[in-house]
Swiss-Prot record:
Enzyme Commission number(s) of this protein: 3.6.1.31
Predominant place of localization: cytoplasm
Alphabetized GO MF terms: ATP binding; phosphoribosyl-ATP diphosphatase activity
Name of protein: Phosphoribosyl-ATP pyrophosphatase
GO BP, sorted A to Z: L-histidine biosynthetic process
EC main group: hydrolase
Cellular component terms per the entry's GO annotation: cytoplasm
Originating species: Ralstonia pickettii (strain 12J)
Length: 124
């Protein structure tokens, strides 16, 4: 994991109310204070903005400016998903671990495995 993501994870932890985060002084603490519904709403907004930036970039012929807008919006989306992870006491390492678990497994194999696991769970 990059140092930037690790440091951001540490900042997020420090902004939790239990760790002294102040909603009056910190945007992150304010999101934590509002709860997961507010965080999820923000993720939805950022996901929509990411989709729109990508569509705009495609329509603009992938200019440098349009590509930069996509990166900007994805950064917002990643940031807010990291807020959610922290809110649920998860870390970027948890996500990296899941990605590592999937490495070398095709998407079709992954989907088939999930269906099999769901069927097994329903039959138990």
């Amino acid at each position: 994991m990059s140092d930037t993501l690790r440091r951001l994870g540490e900042v997020l932890e420090s902004r939790k109310l239990a760790n002294g985060g102040d909603p009056e002084k910190s945007y992150i603490a304010r999101l934590f204070n509002k709860g997961d519904d507010a965080i999820l709403k923000k993720i939805g907004e950022e996901a929509t903005e990411t989709v729109m930036a990508a569509k705009d970039a495609r329509a603009a012929g992938m200019t440098d400016e349009a590509r930069s807008k996509v990166v900007y919006e994805v950064a917002d989306l990643w940031f807010h998903t990291m807020v959610l992870l922290s809110h649920f006491d998860l870390t970027p390492d948890d996500v990296v671990g899941e990605l590592a678990r999937r490495e070398g497994l095709s998407g079709l194999e992954e989907k088939a495995l999930r269906k099999l696991q769901a069927r097994d769970a329903a039959g138990d």
